[in-house]
C-alpha cells in the first residue's frame, strides 16, 4: 500500500446516511488522499483520529454536484460527490479552485478502475429523492451520462489579469511513472473493423496515446501505426502483472478450473487463478495418476512469507521474489507437488472477450453487413436468428416486431447499454435503426437459454456446477448493481449459456420497453409474478434489491434443474402466498448453505436483502468450500 500523500485539506462532509434512521449532519474533517485510500480524520491524520476511509479502487464516480443556487447549510459552498460501493459521499470545498483540484486528482487515481459508472446523478439526494430526476430509490440508476474523461461541468474561472503575464509552472509530478509512457501487452488478437482501429497481435507491445473512452483506447504499434483498440484486450507491462502470462486465469473459480483442466486431459496441466481470499492466488493442477490409478485435481495456495522483502512459495523450502519465478521453478521441479507444472491451460487465445461494440463509437450497424442464418427462437419482441457480421463474426439478431417495443426510447438507451461490458453479460454490439423492422445485434451464445439447458440435461449436473452457474449470474448482476443498472426481469429464461458452459445475463433493462399490457401490468397474465418481490407486484417499485429477490428464484430454478416456481399455483395465488410469508421449498440438490442464500434474497423488506456484492462474496466462499458439496 502506498501512503504517499497526494492531497490533504480540511473539508466538510455530509453524513452518508447508510441507514434510513441515520441523522443528516455536516462535519469538518481532515481529508487525505493517497494512491490507495481517501481517508478522513477528526483533527489530526493519526489512526486513532480516523473517522472513515474509502478504498480508491471501489470508487465508481467523482464529479461536481450541480446545486442550482440551492441552500448549502455549511460554510463551504462548493460540493462534489464520491460514489463508492452502494453509497455517495458529498464533500464541500472552501473554494472552486479547491474543489476542482480534488475532483481532478481523484479522477486521475480512479481512471483505471473497472467499475466506473455509465450514468450518475448530478444533483443531491435530499429528503428521500434525487433532486435531478426525483427518483426515490437511493440505488436508482443514474439519469445523466457520466464521462470520467470530460472536464468538470463548471467552466474554469478566467485567470486574474496579473497572472496572464506569464504561464503558470507545470504541476509537480506525483510519481515518476505518471510521466512515463504507458506500454501495454496484447492478451488477444484483434482485427481492425474500421479504418480508425488498430490491429492487435497477441504478445506484442503497444504504446497508449489516449484514454478518452473506458472501453476503447488510442494506441500505436511498433511500426508507427495508430488507432483504437479494445481496452480489455491489453494489460499493463509490469513485472507484477500476471495478466500477461498464459497460465493466469483471472475470473476462474474452482469448478470452472477443474472443468477446463479435465477437458484438456494432460498430465501436469495447470493454471494460476485468483483465490477466494482477496489478494491471494491458487495453482490448480491436474494429474492422471492422482492415487489408486485415478486422475485428480490439486489446488495449492501460493503462500507469502512474513519477511521483508516478501517472498512467495508453494513448497516452503523454495521461496521466490515473484509468482512467475515460482511457476518457472515448478515447471522443472515437482518439489512437493503431485507432479511438476508441465502444461499451461488457459482460455486466452481461444475465447477472446467481447468488445463494447465492434469498433470505437460504432453502435449503428449497416444491415447489409449482416447475414441471416437459422432461427434460434422467438421472444417478447420478435424472432431471434443466428447470423454473421461481415461474414466473419457470429451474432444473434433480434428482429423487433412492430408494436412490440417503445423503439425511440430503446434506441437512445442502446448507446448506454452498449457500454455495459462484462464477461458475464451478453454483449450488445449495436442496432440497425434505419429500416423496419429494427434489429438488435448481440453476442451469440452457442448453448442457448439457461432454462432449456437445465431441463434438457436433468440428472447430469453436479452440485458444484450448478453453484458455478449461480456464481456466473451473480457476477454479471454485481456489475449491473455497481453501475446502478436494474435488470427488472432476471430469470433463467433470460440467461444464456456459451459453448464453454459460461452463463451470461441477457435482456437487462429490456422490460422497460415492452408495450404489451399483459406483460407490463402486474395483473396481466404474462407478468412474471413468480420472480417478483412484494414491492414490485404491489407498487411496481423496481430496484437492485428487487433484482436480488429474482436472483434467489433463479437460484431455485438452477438447483431444481429448470422447474417452474410455484408450478401448481396461479399468479393471484402466488401473490397471496408470498404476502403471507410463504417461500419456495428447499431443492434436493441445494445444501442448507445454498438454501440459506436463497432465503436471504427473499426477505420481505428490500433493505433486509443482501446486495449482489454481498451475495457474490458468499457464493465465492461456497464455491471454494469442499464441505459444501459433501466431497
Swiss-Prot record:
Positions that bind ATP: 376-384, 398
Activity control mechanisms: Activated by tyrosine phosphorylation by a wide range of cytokine stimulations. When T-cells or B-cells receptors are activated, a series of phosphorylation leads to the recruitment of TEC to the cell membrane, where it is phosphorylated at Tyr-519. Also activated in response to SCF. Integrin engagement induces tyrosine phosphorylation of TEC in platelets. STAP1 participates in a positive feedback loop by increasing the activity of TEC. SOCS1 is an inhibitor of TEC kinase activity.
Keywords for the protein's UniProt record, in alphabetical order: Adaptive immunity, ATP-binding, Cell membrane, Cytoplasm, Cytoskeleton, Immunity, Kinase, Lipid-binding, Membrane, Metal-binding, Nucleotide-binding, Phosphoprotein, SH2 domain, SH3 domain, Transferase, Tyrosine-protein kinase, Zinc, Zinc-finger
Entry PTM: Following B-cell or T-cell receptors engagement, translocates to the plasma membrane where it gets phosphorylated at Tyr-519. Undergoes also tyrosine phosphorylation during platelet activation.
UniProt keyword annotation of tRNA-binding present: no
Zinc finger residue extent: Btk-type: 113-149
Swiss-Prot/TrEMBL catalytic activity: L-tyrosyl-[protein] + ATP = O-phospho-L-tyrosyl-[protein] + ADP + H(+)
UniProt-listed GO biological process terms: adaptive immune response; B cell receptor signaling pathway; integrin-mediated signaling pathway; intracellular signal transduction; protein phosphorylation; regulation of platelet activation; T cell receptor signaling pathway; tissue regeneration
Primary site of residence: cytoplasm
SUPFAM superfamilies, alphabetized: PH domain-like, Protein kinase-like (PK-like), SH2 domain, SH3-domain
Region Disordered, residue ranges: 157-178
Membrane topology: Peripheral membrane protein
Cofactor: Zn(2+)
Domain SH2: residue ranges: 247-345
Enzyme Commission identifier(s): 2.7.10.2
Cellular localization per UniProt: Cytoplasm; Cell membrane; Cytoplasm, Cytoskeleton
GO cellular component, one term: cytosol
Cofactor: how and how many bound: Binds 1 zinc ion per subunit.
Similarity annotation: Belongs to the protein kinase superfamily. Tyr protein kinase family. TEC subfamily.
Subunit-structure text: Part of a complex composed of EEIG1, TNFRSF11A/RANK, PLCG2, GAB2, TEC and BTK; complex formation increases in the presence of TNFSF11/RANKL. Interacts with INPP5D/SHIP1 and INPPL1/SHIP2. Interacts with CD28, FASLG, FGF2, GRB10, LYN and KIT. Interacts with VAV1 and JAK2.
Notes on the domains: The PH domain mediates the binding to inositol polyphosphate and phosphoinositides, leading to its targeting to the plasma membrane. It is extended in the BTK kinase family by a region designated the TH (Tec homology) domain, which consists of about 80 residues preceding the SH3 domain.
This protein's name: Tyrosine-protein kinase Tec
Organism per entry: Homo sapiens (Human)
Amino acid at each position: 500500500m502506498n501512503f504517499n500523500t497526494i492531497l490533504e485539506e480540511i473539508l466538510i462532509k455530509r453524513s452518508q446516511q447508510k441507514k434510513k434512521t441515520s441523522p443528516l449532519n455536516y462535519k469538518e474533517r481532515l481529508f487525505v488522499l493517497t494512491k490507495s485510500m481517501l481517508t478522513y480524520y477528526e483533527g489530526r491524520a493519526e489512526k486513532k483520529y480516523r473517522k472513515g476511509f474509502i478504498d480508491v479502487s471501489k470508487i465508481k464516480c467523482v464529479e461536481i454536484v450541480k446545486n442550482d443556487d440551492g441552500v448549502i447549510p455549511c460554510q463551504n459552498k462548493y460540493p462534489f460527490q464520491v460514489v463508492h460501493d452502494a453509497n455517495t459521499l458529498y464533500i464541500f470545498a472552501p473554494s472552486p479552485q479547491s474543489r476542482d483540484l480534488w475532483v481532478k486528482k481523484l479522477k486521475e487515481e480512479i481512471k483505471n478502475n473497472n467499475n466506473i459508472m455509465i450514468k450518475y446523478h448530478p444533483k443531491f439526494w435530499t429528503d428521500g429523492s434525487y433532486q435531478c430526476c426525483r427518483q426515490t430509490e437511493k440505488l436508482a440508476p443514474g439519469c445523466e451520462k457520466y464521462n470520467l474523461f470530460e472536464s468538470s461541468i463548471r467552466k474554469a474561472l478566467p485567470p486574474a489579469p496579473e497572472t496572464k503575464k506569464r504561464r503558470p509552472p507545470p504541476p509537480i509530478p506525483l510519481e515518476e511513472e505518471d510521466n512515463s509512457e504507458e506500454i501495454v501487452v496484447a492478451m488477444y488478437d484483434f482485427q481492425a473493423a474500421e479504418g480508425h482501429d488498430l490491429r492487435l497481435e497477441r504478445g506484442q507491445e503497444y504504446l497508449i496515446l489516449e484514454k478518452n473512452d473506458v472501453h476503447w483506447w488510442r494506441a500505436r504499434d511498433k511500426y508507427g501505426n495508430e488507432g483504437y483498440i479494445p481496452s480489455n484486450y491489453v494489460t499493463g507491462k509490469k513485472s507484477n502483472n500476471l495478466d500477461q502470462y498464459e497460465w493466469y486465469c483471472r475470473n476462474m473459480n474452482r469448478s470452472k478450473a477443474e472443468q477446463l483442466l479435465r477437458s484438456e486431459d494432460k498430465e501436469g496441466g495447470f493454471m494460476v487463478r485468483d483465490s477466494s481470499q482477496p489478494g491471494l492466488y491458487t495453482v490448480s493442477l491436474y494429474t492422471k495418476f492422482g492415487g489408486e490409478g485415478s486422475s485428480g485435481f490439486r489446488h495449492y495456495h501460493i503462500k507469502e512469507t512474513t519477511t521483508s522483502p516478501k517472498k512467495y512459495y508453494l513448497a516452503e523450502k523454495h521461496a521466490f521474489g515473484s509468482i512467475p519465478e515460482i511457476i518457472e521453478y515448478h515447471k522443472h521441479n515437482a518439489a512437493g507437488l503431485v507432479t511438476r507444472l508441465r502444461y499451461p491451460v488457459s482460455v486466452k487465445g481461444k475465447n477472446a472477450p467481447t468488445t463494447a461494440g465492434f469498433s470505437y463509437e460504432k453502435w449503428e450497424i449497416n444491415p447489409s453487413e449482416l447475414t441471416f442464418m437459422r432461427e434460434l427462437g422467438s421472444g417478447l419482441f420478435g424472432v431471434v436468428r443466428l447470423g454473421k457480421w461481415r461474414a466473419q463474426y457470429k451474432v444473434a439478431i433480434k428482429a423487433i416486431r412492430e408494436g412490440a417495443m417503445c423503439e425511440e426510447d430503446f434506441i437512445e438507451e442502446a448507446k448506454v447499454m452498449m457500454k455495459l461490458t462484462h464477461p458475464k453479460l451478453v454483449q450488445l454490439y449495436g442496432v440497425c435503426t434505419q429500416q423496419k423492422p429494427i434489429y438488435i445485434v448481440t453476442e451469440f451464445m452457442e448453448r442457448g437459454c439457461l432454462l432449456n439447458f437445465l431441463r434438457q440435461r436433468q440428472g447430469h449436473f453436479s452440485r458444484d456446477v450448478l453453484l458455478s452457474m449461480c456464481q456466473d449470474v451473480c457476477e454479471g448482476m454485481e456489475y449491473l448493481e455497481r453501475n446502478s443498472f436494474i435488470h427488472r426481469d432476471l430469470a433463467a429464461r433470460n440467461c444464456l449459456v456459451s459453448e464453454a458452459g459460461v452463463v451470461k445475463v441477457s435482456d437487462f433493462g429490456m422490460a422497460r420497453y415492452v408495450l404489451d399490457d399483459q406483460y407490463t401490468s402486474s395483473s396481466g397474465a404474462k407478468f412474471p409474478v413468480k420472480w417478483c418481490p412484494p414491492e414490485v407486484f404491489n407498487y411496481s417499485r423496481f430496484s437492485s434489491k428487487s433484482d436480488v429477490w429474482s436472483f434467489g428464484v433463479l437460484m431455485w430454478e438452477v438447483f431444481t434443474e429448470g422447474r417452474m416456481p410455484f408450478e401448481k399455483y396461479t399468479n393471484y395465488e402466488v401473490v397471496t402466498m408470498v404476502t403471507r410469508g410463504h417461500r419456495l421449498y428447499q431443492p434436493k440438490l441445494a445444501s442448507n448453505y445454498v438454501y440459506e442464500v436463497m432465503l436471504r434474497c427473499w426477505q420481505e423488506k428490500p433493505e433486509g436483502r443482501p446486495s449482489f456484492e454481498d451475495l457474490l462474496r458468499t457464493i465465492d466462499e461456497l464455491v471454494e468450500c469442499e464441505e459444501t458439496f459433501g466431497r
